[in-house]
């Protein structure tokens, strides 16, 4: 709907490494808007507070450098889960 109306989508993410990876995969698949030869860069707003489920849940967590993040590669969302940390939070 946003693309059909030439509206830019900027996802907001708050939560775990899994949500971060899913949001990045979504962002990577959004079309460029506005439709031009010089599209706006993709933007993502996300929480930077301390959160072990975002920074330690994935064995290779998403990090940013100079305002840029790398989209995880690999099967599914591209994450390998830190099962030791996960078991710490399991009920």
Task: State where each predicted segment sits.
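C-terminal extensions of enzymes
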Residues: 51-91
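Shared catalytic-loop signature of beta/alpha-barrel
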Residues: 1-68
């Amino acid at each position: 709907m946003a693309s059909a109306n030439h509206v830019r989508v900027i996802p907001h993410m708050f939560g775990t490494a899994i949500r971060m990876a899913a949001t990045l995969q979504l962002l990577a698949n959004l079309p460029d808007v506005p439709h031009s030869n010089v599209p706006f860069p993709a933007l993502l707003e996300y929480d930077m507070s301390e959160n072990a489920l975002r920074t330690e849940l994935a064995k290779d967590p998403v990090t940013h450098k100079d305002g840029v993040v790398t989209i995880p590669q690999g099967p599914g969302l591209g994450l390998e889960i830190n099962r030791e940390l996960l078991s710490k939070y399991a009920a």
